[in-house]
From Swiss-Prot:
Pfam families: DUF2080 (PF09853). InterPro entries: DUF2080_transposon-encoded (IPR019205). It comes from Methanocaldococcus jannaschii (strain ATCC 43067 / DSM 2661 / JAL-1 / JCM 10045 / NBRC 100440). It comes from the Archaea. This is Uncharacterized protein MJ0362.
Amino acid sequence: MKIRKKTWRLPKDATISFKGVVKPIGNSGMILIPKDYVGCKVLVTILDELGNEEFEIVETEKS
């Protein structure tokens, strides 16, 4: 994804990220996430290029 602002010469690359808390997934026979990580805060970033979208930053007046 690319972000553009009128005052920038070139658009900047950006990635999408999500904030969350790890929860246990799976059953006792096949645990997908180690127990040490359950309850920890995580940041998940999507690295695959899903599209070549470009967004423009629009500044608004603060009141």
